[in-house]
Amino acid sequence: MKLHELKPAAGSKKAPKRIGRGTGSGLGRNAGKGEKGQNARSGGGVRPGFEGGQMPLYRRLPKRGFTNIFAKKIVSINLDRLNIFENGTEVTPELLLERRVVSKVLDGVKILGNGTLEKSLTVKGCKFSKSAIEKIEAAGGKVEVM
């Protein structure tokens, strides 16, 4: 096979629809817009959510709840993500950020107990689930709860 013999995969290069170019093209005359009416006009059509004048669904349903602007934004990670550290490492939120285990530390980091921990680590400055504390201590590590 040579460079000039290369061809794209069958069906991967689909020609665009050329509408309104005569009846022989299959998309002439009304160009796929049907007969008259709002949708046949240029710029025609209705906005998203419009139901023909009937009260639309997004206005029929009541508003509900609010966003608490004082909510603590805590980043959570599972135990098995801590296996990247060497035995005896002191793991802090800053170290997790530096090693890109978390992308940002907002109002803190919480360690959850999913997975297994194979290293003996000292974890500081984080929140923990009960199962995470048990697994860290079972692996020979220490937990310093904030």
Swiss-Prot record:
Pfam annotation, one family: Ribosomal_L27A
Cystine bridges: none
GO molecular function, one term: structural constituent of ribosome
InterPro entries found in the cross-reference section: Ribosomal_uL15 (IPR030878), Ribosomal_uL15/eL18 (IPR021131), Ribosomal_uL15/eL18_sf (IPR036227), Ribosomal_uL15_bac-type (IPR005749), Ribosomal_uL15_CS (IPR001196)
Region spans: Disordered: 1-54
Classification via PROSITE patterns: RIBOSOMAL_L15
Protein origin, superkingdom: Bacteria
Swiss-Prot/TrEMBL keywords: Ribonucleoprotein, Ribosomal protein, RNA-binding, rRNA-binding
GO biological process: translation
Keyword Ribosomal protein tagged: yes
Biased composition (Gly residues): 21-31, 42-52
GO CC terms of this entry: cytosolic large ribosomal subunit
Protein family: Belongs to the universal ribosomal protein uL15 family.
Function comment: Binds to the 23S rRNA.
Record-linked PANTHER family: 50S RIBOSOMAL PROTEIN L15, LARGE RIBOSOMAL SUBUNIT PROTEIN UL15M
Record note on quaternary structure: Part of the 50S ribosomal subunit.
Protein name: Large ribosomal subunit protein uL15
Organism (species): Clostridium beijerinckii (strain ATCC 51743 / NCIMB 8052) (Clostridium acetobutylicum)
Gene: rplO
